[in-house]
């Protein structure tokens, strides 16, 4: 077998700054300038709020084919680790969770909407019909799942993945039955895919307004902004820990699981605290007597494009290259000695040059952060009025520029 790429050994950057066609400092300066100019342009030209909130979540029952496919996916996530003897580099299990469900289906959602909801493997049993109200359970489980992905030493081990999904199945099903929760309230993967489907491309004109409205009408379930911020924080940690800068800063401590756990939570706390401070600052300078928690929840959707940009750029290489191993991994899906397709070896086709891949990542990064600035500006006008909108957004702008530079740093250095 020829496997030129294995999960979690792939570098997200392109190798070194010297590989870039233009100086790295120029990339950072121009990117920051683009975000700031977007902010200035909006202040001059966008004087009224035009985006509305209207989303209503309806818990849908899975179709028969969806249940069959979802059951198959669940079996491939759980059984191989307990009945087979496949390693992570040949098992289908890590490919399904970390490529298929983690990045592949969300990208398809840009065109087809929330596909995951039609086969959700964690929602095979009937769920509550109550209206969703909060996503605290989903947020907690998402934090645990990403800790397993980023801190646990063997996130690709089929047995470990199977154990995690047994726990997820028990917790989500138990919460839906005993606490009368809906799937989107307790299933981190369901909520993740629902959020990314909000960026679905539209053929209706004006295209940009339809996409912005689709994001802006995100339901304000309690805890929603924290889930989105965790999406940003976890990828931020993963990006930084893979750089030589991180190792030079902390040395051999980076190999310790205790330190990694501390750093993982610390970065998420920093992201959340910065966001909360930005909301507090907006209220303070506006003079409005509004509840901080309410404003924090209202601005949650403005961070979604950044979360999506982080996610796509970070895992794009896995989607493009690791997905090519699917037939080999499916050749013996349960690790019991089958030979379904007769595939004995596979070679990865790196059809994009490193600089070409980097260019796509930079474009997606800038586009996501620019969308965030637009959404925040529109909401600021709605809440505080046009004359106050720019002042209330200074900290949000600073955070956006900081996240942009951090993302480009991770993508561009070894």
Positions of the model-derived regions?
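Hydrophobic alpha-helical transmembrane segments and adjacent short intramembrane/lumenal linkers
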Residues: 303-311, 318-377
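Hydrophobic alpha-helical membrane-insertion segments
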Residues: 101, 105-107, 225-236, 302-325, ...
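Final/C-terminal transmembrane alpha-helix of multipass membrane proteins
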Residues: 311, 390-414
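Transmembrane-helix bundle segments that line or gate the permeation/cavity pathway
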Residues: 2-210, 217-224, 237-238, 370
């Amino acid at each position: 077998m020829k496997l030129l790429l294995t999960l979690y050994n792939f570098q997200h950057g392109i190798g070194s700054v010297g590989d870039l066609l233009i100086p790295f400092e120029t990339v950072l300066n121009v990117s920051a300038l683009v975000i700031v100019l977007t902010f200035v342009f909006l202040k001059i030209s966008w004087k009224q709020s035009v985006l509305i909130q209207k989303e209503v979540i309806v818990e849908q029952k899975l179709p028969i084919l969806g249940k069959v496919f979802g059951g198959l996916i669940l079996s491939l996530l759980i059984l191989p680790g307990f009945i087979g003897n496949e390693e992570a580099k040949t098992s289908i299990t890590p490919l399904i969770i970390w490529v298929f469900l983690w990045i592949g289906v969300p990208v398809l959602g840009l065109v087809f909407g929330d596909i995951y909801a039609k086969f959700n493997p964690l929602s095979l049993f009937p769920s509550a019909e109550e209206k969703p109200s909060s996503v605290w359970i989903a947020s907690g489980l998402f934090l645990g799942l990403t800790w397993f992905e980023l801190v646990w030493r063997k996130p690709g081990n089929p047995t470990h993945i199977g154990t995690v999904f047994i726990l997820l199945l028990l917790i989500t099903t138990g919460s839906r039955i005993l606490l009368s929760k809906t799937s989107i309230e307790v299933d981190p993967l369901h909520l993740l895919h629902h959020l990314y489907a909000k960026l679905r491309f539209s053929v209706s004109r004006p295209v940009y307004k339809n996409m912005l409205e689709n994001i802006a009408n995100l339901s304000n379930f309690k805890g929603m902004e924290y889930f989105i911020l965790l999406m940003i924080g976890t990828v931020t940690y993963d990006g930084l820990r893979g750089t030589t800068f991180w190792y030079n800063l902390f040395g051999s401590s980076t190999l310790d699981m205790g330190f990694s756990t501390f750093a993982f939570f610390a970065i998420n706390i920093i992201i959340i605290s910065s966001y909360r401070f930005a909301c507090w600052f907006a209220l303070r300078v506006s003079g409005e007597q509004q509840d901080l928690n309410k404003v924090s929840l209202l601005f949650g959707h403005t961070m979604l494009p950044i979360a999506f940009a982080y996610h796509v750029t970070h895992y794009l290489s896995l989607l493009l290259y690791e997905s090519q191993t699917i037939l080999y991994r499916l050749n013996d899906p349960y690790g019991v000695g089958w030979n379904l397709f007769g595939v004995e070896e596979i070679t990865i086709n790196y059809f994009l040059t490193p600089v070409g891949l980097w260019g796509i990542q930079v474009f997606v990064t800038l586009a996501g952060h620019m969308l965030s600035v637009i959404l925040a500006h529109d909401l600021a006008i709605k809440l505080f009025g046009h004359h106050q909108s720019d002042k209330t957004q200074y900290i949000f702008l600073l955070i956006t520029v900081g996240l942009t530079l951090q993302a480009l740093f991770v993508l561009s250095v070894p």
